């Protein structure tokens, strides 16, 4: 199905005939419009023939392969590119206050503070502006290829990616030493001596030295150590400022007087004491508990006996079925042997007749 907006067009006249400006008026069908769609425009005045080479005499080609495939070049090319652009920016900043028009001045423009501000209508566009722009771009791009490998460049710093072994070590250390928020600093103890507080501080540094050395860069200074809580508050508070097991046992013993805690406080390293129950056997609670336990034991035993009886009954049923099937197999085997003996005693002629009668 053809579209109603497109029509057949006439072939475009060659360039030579266009420059010679034929006297006939151009047809509207050449522009994709239907014939007779509008009034024919007046014929254009003949233009003087102009050579095609006069558009831009100093036309040069620019190699942009470096921007299309930068992987084919080394890192020095990119470093030189960035350094050259920074030098150009510095030169622009230095030449700006001096009164120059910057990179936007064209040749022949009046120099001065108002040179770049003056309108183009007063002076007219400069001749050969396209050629000047092409030469400007060539001058900007040529030093990029000339300065590659210059000895005056500073050494290029290449960022190294972390290896898999280092990442595995960091993950292992992060699992062994998980980050925990530091506890708030405790109030200074009036009777604590500096020598008494030195040992926990040293142990804290030793415990966290592996994690600190892995996460810090070589050039960064070591941060100050985290203040260590006082050893007097260790039984009450754990490593993360939470109540230790000793305080929980004490609170449980205070709530239930029938529970007694064994010796040993929480966080001492020797292990918390085992809690032992002392229940009075003459109390009603003990009797109710024993009765419930006995009932549960009886129920479980009754269920076990019932399952045993059901299993025995099923075994008996299966055994009887097996005997019945065995007897049936023996009977069928005897009948088969009898039939085989009968067919063996019959002559072949009778067998042929029997087969003919069946057919």
UniProtKB/Swiss-Prot annotation:
Location of Phosphothreonine modifications: 222, 226
Residue ranges of the region described as Required for interaction with TRIB1: 54-72
Effect of residue 298 to A: No effect on DNA-binding, represses E2F1:TFDP1-mediated transcription and causes adipose hypoplasia and myeloid dysplasia
Region (Required to repress E2F1:TFDP1-mediated transcription, to inhibit cell cycle and to induce adipocyte differentiation): 1-70
Region (Required to functionally cooperate with SREBF1 in promoter activation): 180-194
Disruption phenotype: Mutants die of hypoglycemia at 7-10 hours after birth. They have defects in the control of hepatic growth and lung development. The liver architecture is disturbed with acinar formation. They show hyperproliferation of type II pneumocytes and disturbed alveolar architecture. At the molecular level, accumulation of glycogen and lipids in the liver and adipose tissues is impaired, and the mutant animals are severely hypoglycemic. In very few cases (less than 1%) mutants are able to survive up to 4 weeks but they are sevrely retarded in development.
Positions bearing the Glycyl lysine isopeptide (Lys-Gly) (interchain with G-Cter in SUMO) cross-link: 159
DNA-binding region, residue range(s): 286-301
Region annotation Disordered: where it falls in the sequence: 1-55, 176-195, 213-293
Stretches assigned to the bZIP domain: 283-346
Pfam families registered for this protein in UniProt: bZIP_2
Leucine-zipper as annotated region, ranges: 318-346
Effect of residue 193 to A: No effect on DNA-binding. Loss of interaction with CDK2 and CDK4 as well as cell cycle inhibition
Biased composition (Low complexity): 29-38, 233-255
Modified residues (N6-acetyllysine): 159
UniProt note: domains: The recognition sequence (54-72) is required for interaction with TRIB1.
Function per UniProt: Transcription factor that coordinates proliferation arrest and the differentiation of myeloid progenitors, adipocytes, hepatocytes, and cells of the lung and the placenta. Binds directly to the consensus DNA sequence 5'-T[TG]NNGNAA[TG]-3' acting as an activator on distinct target genes. During early embryogenesis, plays essential and redundant functions with CEBPB. Essential for the transition from common myeloid progenitors (CMP) to granulocyte/monocyte progenitors (GMP). Critical for the proper development of the liver and the lung.
Descriptive protein name: CCAAT/enhancer-binding protein alpha
């Amino acid at each position: 199905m053809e579209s109603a907006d497109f029509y057949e067009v006439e072939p475009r006249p060659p360039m030579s005939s266009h420059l010679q400006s034929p006297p006939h008026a151009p047809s509207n069908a050449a522009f994709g419009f239907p014939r007779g769609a509008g009034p024919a425009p007046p014929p254009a005045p003949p233009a003087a023939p102009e050579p095609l080479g006069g558009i831009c005499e100093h036309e040069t080609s620019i190699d942009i392969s470096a921007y299309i495939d930068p992987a084919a070049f080394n890192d020095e090319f990119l470093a030189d590119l960035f350094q050259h652009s920074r030098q150009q920016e510095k030169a622009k900043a230095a030449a700006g206050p001096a009164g120059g028009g910057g990179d936007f001045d064209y040749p022949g423009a009046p120099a001065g503070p108002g040179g770049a501000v003056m309108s183009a209508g007063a002076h007219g566009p400069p001749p050969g502006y396209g050629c000047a722009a092409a030469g400007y771009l060539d001058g900007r791009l040529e030093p990029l290829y000339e300065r590659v490998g210059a000895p005056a460049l500073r050494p290029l710093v290449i960022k190294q990616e972390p290896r898999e072994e280092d990442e595995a070590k960091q993950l292992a250390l992060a699992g062994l030493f998980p980050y925990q928020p530091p506890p708030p600093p405790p109030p200074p103890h009036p009777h604590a001596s500096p020598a008494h507080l030195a040992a926990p501080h040293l142990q804290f540094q030793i415990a966290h030295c592996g994690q600190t050395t892995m996460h810090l860069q070589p050039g960064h200074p070591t941060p100050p150590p985290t203040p260590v809580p006082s050893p007097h508050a260790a039984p009450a508070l754990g490593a993360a400022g939470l109540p230790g097991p000793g305080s929980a046992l004490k609170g449980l013993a205070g709530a239930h007087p029938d529970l007694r805690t064994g010796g040993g406080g929480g966080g001492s390293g020797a292990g918390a004491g085992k809690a032992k129950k002392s229940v009075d056997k003459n109390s009603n609670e003990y009797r109710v508990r024993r009765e419930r336990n006995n009932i549960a034991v009886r129920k479980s035993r009754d269920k076990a006996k019932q399952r045993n009886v059901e299993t025995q009954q099923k075994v008996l049923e299966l055994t009887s079925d097996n005997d019945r099937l065995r007897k049936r197999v023996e009977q069928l085997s005897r009948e088969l042997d009898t039939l085989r003996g009968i067919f063996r005693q019959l002559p072949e002629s009778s067998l042929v007749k029997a087969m003919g009668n069946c057919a």
